[in-house]
């Protein structure tokens, strides 16, 4: 068995590898290739059992991205250890609440990929209720907030926004729609949207307004109060979970890895697969 310390100077460690896979999976153009690769999907499954919680969370984020592609779901569901590993993450008492919710969502997506009868639907609902029980009362439901962010106009600003949102305890996921300067954020029901605005305002270069729909269905921008809101911060800075496919056209590629190209992604997949085989197969 190779220790991570012996290879750290030569190869990236587990967290950097899984984070790179997560970033590659964020680009819709890479998702099929990652799932078809012989080493990446099994590696992500093994990462779900990693002792380092950020590695587990990042692996789940990558899987959630991959599951957004409907063509991937059957293969993912049938991959050896996938569903069992997701169950283990959900049921493990030491798993953080947001991580359990993320694993539960992936499980439900894959479990429902070929469901056609009522029994299967009931099984999925039962599964969701069980996951909610594990999450506790403060995590029963999540809500989605759509933000229009003035100043969100390049990758450096997006990175600033990511860092600000990742610090907020209760943020489950977010995805960017750069073409329209928007961010779709999924948060726990007990977190106020004003906390998101305060975090974004703390960057000093961006300001958020909430996007809401009127009774007639028209979108409106609602400004937040300028009064800062006290924000409970994460101590371990978990990663985020992507939302469902954006209603805007996919070519926006708002969540693409910076500088990613199909050929570059394929090259990096080879590097990642090589690392996974060296690290996990013995």
Curated annotation (Swiss-Prot):
GO terms for cellular component: cytosol; mitochondrial outer membrane. Residues 246-255 have a biased composition (Basic and acidic residues). Residues 239-261 are annotated as: Disordered. GO terms for molecular function: metal ion binding. The keyword Acetylation applies. It comes from the Eukaryota. The modification Phosphothreonine is found at residue 137. Keywords: Acetylation, Cytoplasm, Membrane, Mitochondrion, Mitochondrion outer membrane, Phosphoprotein. ARM repeats lie at residues 39-81. InterPro entries: ARM-like (IPR011989), ARM-type_fold (IPR016024), Armadillo (IPR000225), ARMC1 (IPR016617), HMA_dom_sf (IPR036163). Gene3D superfamilies: Leucine-rich Repeat Variant (1.25.10.10). The modification N-acetylmethionine is found at residue 1. It is found in: Cytoplasm; Mitochondrion; Mitochondrion outer membrane. In association with mitochondrial contact site and cristae organizing system (MICOS) complex components and mitochondrial outer membrane sorting assembly machinery (SAM) complex components may regulate mitochondrial dynamics playing a role in determining mitochondrial length, distribution and motility. This is Armadillo repeat-containing protein 1.
């Amino acid at each position: 068995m190779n220790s991570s310390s012996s290879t750290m100077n030569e190869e990236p460690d587990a967290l950097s590898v899984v984070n790179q896979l997560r970033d590659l999976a964020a680009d819709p153009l890479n998702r099929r290739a990652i799932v078809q690769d012989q080493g990446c999907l099994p590696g992500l499954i093994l990462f779900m059992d990693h002792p380092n919680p950020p590695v587990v969370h990042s692996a789940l984020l990558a899987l959630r991205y991959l599951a957004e592609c409907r063509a991937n779901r059957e293969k993912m569901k049938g991959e050896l250890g996938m569903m069992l590993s997701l169950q283990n993450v959900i049921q493990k008492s030491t798993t953080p609440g947001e991580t359990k919710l993320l694993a539960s969502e992936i499980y439900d997506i894959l479990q429902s990929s070929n469901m056609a009868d009522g029994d299967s639907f009931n099984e999925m609902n039962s599964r969701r209720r069980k996951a909610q029980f594990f999450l506790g009362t403060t995590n029963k439901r999540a809500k989605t907030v759509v933000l229009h962010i003035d100043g969100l106009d390049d990758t450096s600003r997006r990175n600033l926004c990511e860092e600000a949102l990742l610090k907020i305890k209760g943020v489950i996921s977010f995805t960017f729609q750069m073409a329209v300067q928007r961010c779709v954020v999924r948060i726990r029901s007990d977190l106020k949207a004003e906390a998101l605005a305060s975090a974004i305002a703390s960057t000093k270069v961006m300001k958020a307004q909430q996007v809401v729909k009127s009774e007639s269905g028209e979108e409106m921008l609602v400004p937040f109060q300028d009064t800062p809101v006290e924000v409970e911060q994460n101590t371990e800075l978990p990663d985020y979970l992507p939302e469902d496919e954006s209603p805007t056209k996919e070519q926006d590629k708002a969540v693409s890895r910076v500088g990613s190209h199909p050929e570059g992604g394929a090259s990096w997949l080879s590097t990642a697969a090589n690392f996974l085989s060296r690290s996990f197969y013995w």
